[in-house]
């Protein structure tokens, strides 16, 4: 979809209202409010309007994300709203973003990262789950080591819907992001129990726990300085790994930068982690991550023969 010609980025801060495009799920709306509060504290006098958009992924609840993939299913219509001028900033769960933006759009930056770990949700009373519901190849590949005898299935829906299905016996366990539960204020839920998984046990998805802000390229220079530098660096490193390795959410690999430690998982190569020196710069770290991804791709190719 083509876009209109927009004024210089300085006009970004002269808008009477800044329109935030977001999905319409309860979690997405919470994240949009978080973005409005964060930006409102940094743009004096700014007012915000939420533009709710149903994406292809929201409309096609019967689709299997494992079969059809997830990258782009939850972002395209939101990006179209930016390009058409119907919105000014898109608020995304960073883990939903493809590695490349459409022409004319950029990821300006991120809000401070929340907890990035996965949470294992078990039906109360279950010790070893016979049936685990997750459509994520990444989660399945890592948790099969914990539960080798379990059968895997998939159910979709927002967080509350999934928890209700689980408590009602649709499965014995599922996996949700810790950040999503925290943002929704869910510390407990009748009929299920929560267990946060250590990062070395289950490496999170690229961008998990991050709220990313996307805008038109002309507005990015004005918006970028307001975003969170440390989180921007983490997201850049994780996306570098993803783009260097290739693939979308159907591929069973993961990357996470936390502290100075970069953790990765590859289904054919296993778990790895490297610790960067405190004084290393982003350019050096990006180079190391690119080399790591290239090495893993070669190792996986060799293993397949």
Map each language-model feature to its residues.
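Small-molecule-sensing regulatory modules
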Residues: 16-54, 59-60, 67, 140, ...
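Nucleotidyltransferase catalytic core that binds NTPs
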Residues: 77-80, 88-92, 100-102, 113, ...
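N-terminal amphipathic/basic-hydrophobic helices that include classical n-h-c signal peptides
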Residues: 1-14
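Structural motif
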Residues: 88-89, 106, 119, 130-131, ...
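Short glycine-rich anion-binding loops that position phosphate/pyrophosphate groups of nucleotides
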Residues: 94-97, 179-181
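Paired acidic/hydrophobic, glycine-rich loop segments that form the ligand-binding mouth/hinge
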Residues: 83-93, 172-177
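A conserved helix-loop-strand patch within extracytoplasmic ligand-binding domains
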Residues: 94-95, 101-150, 200
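Short, structured active-site "lid" loops
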Residues: 63-88
């Amino acid at each position: 979809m083509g876009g209109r010609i927009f004024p210089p980025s300085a006009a970004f801060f002269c808008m009477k209202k800044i329109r935030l495009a977001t999905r319409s799920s309860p979690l997405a709306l919470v994240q949009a409010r978080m973005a409005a509060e964060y930006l409102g504290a940094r743009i004096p006098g700014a007012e915000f309007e939420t533009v709710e958009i149903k994406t292809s992924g929201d409309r096609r609840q019967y689709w299997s994300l494992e079969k059809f993939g997830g990258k782009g299913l939850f972002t395209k219509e939101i990006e179209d709203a930016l390009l058409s001028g119907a919105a000014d900033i898109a608020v995304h769960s960073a883990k939903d973003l493809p590695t490349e933006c459409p022409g004319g759009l950029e990821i300006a930056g991120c809000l401070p990262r929340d907890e990035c770990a996965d949470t294992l949700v078990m039906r109360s009373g279950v010790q070893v789950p016979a049936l685990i519901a997750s459509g994520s190849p990444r989660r399945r590949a890592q948790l099969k080591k914990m539960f080798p005898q379990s059968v895997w299935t998939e159910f979709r829906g927002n967080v509350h819907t999934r928890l209700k299905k689980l408590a009602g016996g649709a499965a014995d366990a599922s996996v949700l992001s810790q950040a999503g539960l925290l943002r929704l204020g869910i510390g407990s839920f009748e009929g299920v129990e929560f267990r946060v998984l250590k990062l070395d046990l289950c490496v999170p998805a690229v961008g998990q726990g991050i709220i990313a802000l996307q805008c038109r390229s002309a507005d990015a220079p004005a918006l970028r300085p307001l975003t969170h530098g440390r989180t921007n660096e983490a997201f850049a490193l994780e996306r570098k790994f993803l783009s260097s390795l290739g693939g979308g959410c159907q591929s069973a690999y993961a990357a996470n930068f936390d502290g100075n430690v970069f953790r990765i998982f590859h289904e054919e190569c296993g778990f790895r982690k490297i610790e960067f020196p405190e004084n290393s710069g982003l350019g050096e770290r990006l180079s190391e991550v690119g080399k790591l991804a290239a090495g893993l791709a070669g190792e996986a190719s060799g293993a397949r023969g």
